[in-house]
């Protein structure tokens, strides 16, 4: 039987964040709604976003990096040539509040590494790690999801195009 001493020893060797703890305490609050498209930062939950976004294009016009495109009358985020700096200009101009400055400034995109990655080929390449402004990529290419905001700096920096954002 596990007693208090066991848990104290366990916790002295393992860090548990508040988010991680609450994820297990309140599992029913976890959203089961999956994204169907990559959305701009500061977007509402996918079900609300899909219902509220009217495809007006104000966010696309406001994006200084030209990363927001309209697909099927909905705003999508396309990080191909520049990262998202999470400036919030898209959220400031959204007339329907599908994007709003009070929503999380996270694109919810996370890097995926292909076999072309030099680190996976046992070569030295710290480019994605050093490019990440939040230091969310470890030397073993593990992503710290609590730090990562999906900006795409890692993808843009990768000169072998081994990173996709999903």
Swiss-Prot record:
Coiled coil: none annotated. [4Fe-4S] cluster 1 binds at residues 53, 56, 59, 94. Keywords: 4Fe-4S, Iron, Iron-sulfur, Metal-binding, Repeat. Pfam families: Fer4, Fer4_7. One of its GO terms (molecular function) is 4 iron, 4 sulfur cluster binding. [4Fe-4S] cluster 2 binds at residues 63, 84, 87, 90. InterPro entries: 4Fe4S_Fe-S-bd (IPR017896), 4Fe4S_Fe_S_CS (IPR017900), NapF (IPR004496), PSI_iron-sulfur_center (IPR050157). GO terms for cellular component: cytoplasm. It comes from the Bacteria. Residues 44-73, 75-104, 139-166 form the 4Fe-4S ferredoxin-type domain. PANTHER family: PHOTOSYSTEM I IRON-SULFUR CENTER, PHOTOSYSTEM I IRON-SULFUR CENTER-RELATED. This is Uncharacterized protein HI_1043.
């Amino acid at each position: 039987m596990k007693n208090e001493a066991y848990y104290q020893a366990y916790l002295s060797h393992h860090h548990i964040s508040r988010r991680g703890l609450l994820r297990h305490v309140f599992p029913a609050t976890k959203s089961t709604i999956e994204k169907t498209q990559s959305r701009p930062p500061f977007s509402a939950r996918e079900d609300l976003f899909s219902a509220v976004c009217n495809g007006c294009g104000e966010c696309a016009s406001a994006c200084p990096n030209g990363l927001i495109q309209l697909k099927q009358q909905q705003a999508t985020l396309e990080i191909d040539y520049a990262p998202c700096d999470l400036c919030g200009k898209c959220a400031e101009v959204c007339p329907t509040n599908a994007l709003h400055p009070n929503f999380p400034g996270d694109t919810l995109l996370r890097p995926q590494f292909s076999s072309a990655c030099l680190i996976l080929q046992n070569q030295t390449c710290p480019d994605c790690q050093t490019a990440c402004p939040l230091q969310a990529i470890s030397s073993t290419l593990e992503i710290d999801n609590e730090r990562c905001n999906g900006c795409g700096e890692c993808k843009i920096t990768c000169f072998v195009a081994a990173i996709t954002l999903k």
